[in-house]
Amino acid sequence: METSTFTTKVGLAQMLKGGVIMDVVTPDQAKIAEEAGAVAVMALERVPADIRKDGGVARMSDPEMIQGIIEAVTIPVMAKSRIGHFVEAQILEAIGVDYIDESEVLTPADEEHHTNKHNFKVPFVCGARNLGEALRRITEGAAMIRTKGEAGTGNVVEAVRHARTMFAEIRRLQTLDPDELFVAAKNLQAPYELVKQIAELGRLPVVNFAAGGIATPADAALMMQLGVDGVFVGSGIFKSGNPAKRAKAIVEATTHFRDAKLLAEISRNLGEAMVGINIDTIPENELLAKRGW
């Protein structure tokens, strides 16, 4: 039963492949995202840039606010729970969100355990900086993986690092013989069967999106050309000068990511991009990607 449920959840996440998922804080923003062609929206009270700026403890959003967004659009709605906060996840499942993001953008509730995602019918998405983190999340029941990037910075460098790291580690697995795969599984702290499956597939067995710092159509196309299955755009759209136009351009860039002429065309006159942050100016203890294990 558990296996078939997991397969169903992976299949639901698969339906988002090739698309853009946008952070929205109001029903109106959700409508703009839907009209621009987003495959799903992420309902939250504050985009990561504001969470980063405001500090304090970031928790699950008010169910009333999430409900308002669910009612405003026809596309799937995601919402974030804190790492390890399985009760927030239970609440999100109860109000009918389509996917739950167990997110390092919110303040972790448990420093040792992530949520056991097999206990839920709703599919989970989780962040990962490398193959080991991705495999541990999949083992816990994640139906979708995304790079952690460094959310709220408008700086794509960490998302690029995480994607390249993961793809390089997968390529390395493909060169190993069966005996060496046992050692690799031990080093990755992941089940041998899963490691073996990835070596055979040459990719993760679930969809793998890019997230964290994607602010322009070029950023989205870069991540797609690196080999991810789709992109999350958080602060990059509604912190920019012309959200509707930028949202549409990022969707087009994600679809036509190899067409440089089109990318040039849709990158024109988008208004001000969000103000970015250089990662090396962020104090170590404020880096969101380091949360989770």
From Swiss-Prot:
InterPro entries: Aldolase_TIM, PdxS/SNZ, PdxS/SNZ_N, RibuloseP-bd_barrel. Keywords: Lyase, Pyridoxal phosphate, Schiff base. It is an enzyme of class 4 (lyase). CDD domains: pdxS. D-ribose 5-phosphate binds at D23, G152, G213, G234, S235. Its EC number is 4.3.3.6. SUPFAM superfamilies: Ribulose-phoshate binding barrel. Gene3D superfamilies: Aldolase class I. The keyword Lyase applies. Belongs to the PdxS/SNZ family. In the presence of PdxT, forms a dodecamer of heterodimers. This is Pyridoxal 5'-phosphate synthase subunit PdxS. It comes from Herpetosiphon aurantiacus (strain ATCC 23779 / DSM 785 / 114-95). The gene is pdxS.
